[in-house]
Amino acid sequence: MSEIIQDLSLEDVLGDRFGRYSKYIIQERALPDVRDGLKPVQRRILYAMYSSGNTHDKNFRKSAKTVGDVIGQYHPHGDSSVYEAMVRLSQDWKLRHVLIEMHGNNGSIDNDPPAAMRYTEAKLSLLAEELLRDINKETVSFIPNYDDTTLEPMVLPSRFPNLLVNGSTGISAGYATDIPPHNLAEVIQATLKYIDNPDITVNQLMKYIKGPDFPTGGIIQGIDGIKKAYESGKGRIIVRSKVEEETLRNGRKQLIITEIPYEVNKSSLVKRIDELRADKKVDGIVEVRDETDRTGLRIAIELKKDVNSESIKNYLYKNSDLQISYNFNMVAISDGRPKLMGIRQIIDSYLNHQIEVVANRTKFELDNAEKRMHIVEGLIKALSILDKVIELIRSSKNKRDAKENLIEVFEFTEEQAEAIVMLQLYRLTNTDIVALEGEHKELEALIKQLRHILDNHDALLNVIKEELNEIKKKFKSERLSLIEAEIEEIKIDKEVMVPSEEVILSMTRHGYIKRTSIRSFNASGVEDIGLKDGDSLLKHQEVNTQDTVLVFTNKGRYLFIPVHKLADIRWKELGQHVSQIVPIEEDEVVINVFNEKDFNTDAFYVFATQNGMIKKSTVPLFKTTRFNKPLIATKVKENDDLISVMRFEKDQLITVITNKGMSLTYNTSELSDTGLRAAGVKSINLKAEDFVVMTEGVSENDTILMATQRGSLKRISFKILQVAKRAQRGITLLKELKKNPHRIVAAHVVTGEHSQYTLYSKSNEEHGLINDIHKSEQYTNGSFIVDTDDFGEVIDMYIS
């Protein structure tokens, strides 16, 4: 035998071979045929069981025997893959109508493996036989099997639209399919309407076929997604569990799950919900129990007293497989090629298949009826000359001679002569001619009817409709999945995710933040806070773990930090720098921090810059879901800094003080609400080389404490301030000196909460009591507190 060697490039060989392989797994493994809704291995399993007589009316047989038949005759692959496919056809949580009945352990909705095939037994279900009905009447084409020892069907007759009824899922080279199961009665009704009106629209079809009907039930949301899928083959719906609420004897409530989304692993779902409880991702769940038994699926989620059960349910919908999205991808083999198909195309392909099946069956039955009628006519003729026929047969040498004599003498056809000689003489003499004439009459009517079906397309369609109606009547069942038109927005109360706890929030001037338990705070006291050298406390207050912290910086940005995300650190220990939580720039400085309990408020923030710009923005604008980077609070122009952020519940007076001692007081009602990216308007009309050092809210009982670079402190009462309009120059608060004039480096509004001040130079600090500073008149420079020759020039002042 001579060898043939081809010189081919590796690129060409790989491309060609992979192309062949891809075509094979697309057509012969992973995708269903649109006509019978089956993949090749499924079709071979059902045909092997049918041809071996393993039908619904017989006893169960070992699954191993069927697997052996399939891999021996039709499917030369591993026995495990065949058995897995066989088991899936028997699982009522995978298929809307099972095609195989199985005795023994056939797996579970917990994804437990089935028992080995040597232990389980199986047979075809009654409905599966409707897929195979009339297969012996030349209804479909057969092809040689893999070793040419027998024949196998290319497709099954499929007397109901199995692709839509049981759906399909699979992945192949470059293609995937996800077709959901549907209600058999609805699918057949839609098919009947399509037969009556081939121009029927998807909207009209959806009056009959409402949407998917999953074997596990559940609630389907999103009519628009269903319609899109039925039109184009692709669409998205939401499938959520059926959850009911029960009240226990102790007054607690529990959520009872009785239906879960399609293809969701129950045990994994229970484990996930329990992990959320154990990890304290959700607050309010006491216990999760799987109470599933022979009566049906049941998962119990016991809740704490007085907890919002609706919010917990919504949290679980969002964070577990209690709710999933299902994506239609209706790809099937049509005319030998994978196609993305809408529901009209699927029904049309199925109907064309049924037209072919019924036509082939009718031709087969017509041929048999005509053959039988020919035989009956011969028998009637023979009975009319019975004595002569008997005499001729007796005088013949053998059966062959008798047959030839009948043809020659009485002009019987070969088929008629064969039928006569095959009858024993006693049967021939006892044959009732009346019965034969009756059969002849029936055959005449049958042939007429069959010819009418073949000659009249409407008659053929009526046969299909009648048979579909019979299947619908015999196998119809109630819809399992409830369909809701709209996809419900999931709203989760913060209380569900975060346990409510009162804690102490602290922020230092150098940007160290922490939350501390009230117990730790009370055990230490304010003075014992953990600080770095040169740092001091900017603010501390009692907040709730369900609150949100807004941290504002000199760059006009803010950090949105849920309190529960802050590390729980003891009061005596150093906190986290905000840059470890949300990255900020090296020269970015924290200027204020606020906590918000509810962003749905009429309160507002006021922002003031060093160069005299100001703006007002309402609190709801600051709510966000982005925690990982700083967000814009206000636009700060180049060579400017944000120096003050205030929060007010309603309009009130604010006072602006500048470095050169100018002061302007006006009402925030003069400011319009603006967006976060706005720069604002002019707050005060600044002199040349002057800048703002303070903008704060003020009231009649307050005083203002100012520090100058020369170590002087000046305290004035509210009555010195003159309420004016925004953007004016204001009044003078310092006595102007020609030599070494005082310049205000810091100023603060003093309320009843404040008792101490701290002065800072580059290397020193000085503490004192605010009440020791007497109130001054307008045109004074205050009292010297420190000697700058020893202390250094004052650069800042804080009050507490």
UniProtKB/Swiss-Prot annotation:
Record has Repressor as a keyword: no
EC code: 5.6.2.2
Keyword DNA-binding set for record: yes
InterPro entries: GyrA/parC_rep (IPR006691), Gyrase/topoIV_suA_C (IPR035516), Topo_IIA-like_dom_sf (IPR013760), Topo_IIA_A/C_ab (IPR013758), Topo_IIA_A_a_sf (IPR013757), Topo_IIA_dom_A (IPR002205), TopoIV_A_Gpos (IPR005741), Type_II_DNA_Topoisomerases (IPR050220)
Record keywords, A-Z: Cell membrane, DNA-binding, Isomerase, Membrane, Topoisomerase
GO terms under cellular component: chromosome; cytoplasm; DNA topoisomerase type II (double strand cut, ATP-hydrolyzing) complex; extrinsic component of plasma membrane
Main subcellular localisation: membrane
Entry's localization field: Cell membrane
GO MF terms, alphabetically ordered: ATP binding; DNA binding; DNA negative supercoiling activity
Residues at the site labelled Transition state stabilizer: 118
Catalytic activity: ATP-dependent breakage, passage and rejoining of double-stranded DNA
N-terminal signal peptide: none
Membrane topology: Peripheral membrane protein
Residues annotated as the enzyme's active site: 119
Site (Interaction with DNA): 39, 75, 77, 88, 94
Domain Topo IIA-type catalytic: 31-495
CDD domains per the UniProt record, alphabetical: TOP4c
Biological processes, Gene Ontology terms: chromosome segregation; DNA topological change
Function text: Topoisomerase IV is essential for chromosome segregation. It relaxes supercoiled DNA. Performs the decatenation events required during the replication of a circular DNA molecule.
PANTHER family associated with the record: DNA GYRASE/TOPOISOMERASE SUBUNIT A, DNA TOPOISOMERASE 4 SUBUNIT A
Quaternary structure (record): Heterotetramer composed of ParC and ParE.
Family: Belongs to the type II topoisomerase GyrA/ParC subunit family. ParC type 2 subfamily.
Protein name: DNA topoisomerase 4 subunit A
Organism from which the protein derives: Staphylococcus aureus (strain N315)
